[in-house]
Amino acid sequence: MGMRMMFTMFLLVVLATTVVSINLDHAFDGRNAAANNKATDLMARTVRRFCSDPPCRISNPESCGWEP
């Protein structure tokens, strides 16, 4: 193989690796977003339960969005 052919093959490998890497990053970001949404929902439910308990609400008014 000539030098030009080897350089062309090298560029094709680099391009293919970059495209695969970018696609994997997007898929990974989607999984992270789904996990973050689940965590946010869990936190919201926990805060609602916490704020529905009068002793907790009175001792932590800033967390429940009101001032005594």
Curated annotation (Swiss-Prot):
Disulfide linkage: C51-C64
Coiled-coil parts of chain: none
Compartment(s): Secreted
Domain of life: Eukaryota
Alphabetic keyword roster: Acetylcholine receptor inhibiting toxin, Disulfide bond, Ion channel impairing toxin, Neurotoxin, Postsynaptic neurotoxin, Secreted, Signal, Toxin
Keyword Disulfide bond attributed: yes
Signal peptide start and end residues: 1-21
Tissue-specificity statement: Expressed by the venom duct.
A GO MF term: ion channel regulator activity
InterPro entries in the cross-refs: Conotoxin_a-typ
Propeptide: 22-49
GO cellular component: extracellular region; host cell postsynaptic membrane
Keyword S-adenosyl-L-methionine found: no
Family note: Belongs to the conotoxin A superfamily.
Additional free-text comment from the UniProt record: The mature peptide contains 3 cysteine residues.
Record comment regarding domains: The cysteine framework is C-C-C.
Protein role: Alpha-conotoxins act on postsynaptic membranes, they bind to the nicotinic acetylcholine receptors (nAChR) and thus inhibit them.
Protein name as it appears in the record: Putative alpha-conotoxin Qc alphaL-1
Source species of the chain: Conus quercinus (Oak cone)
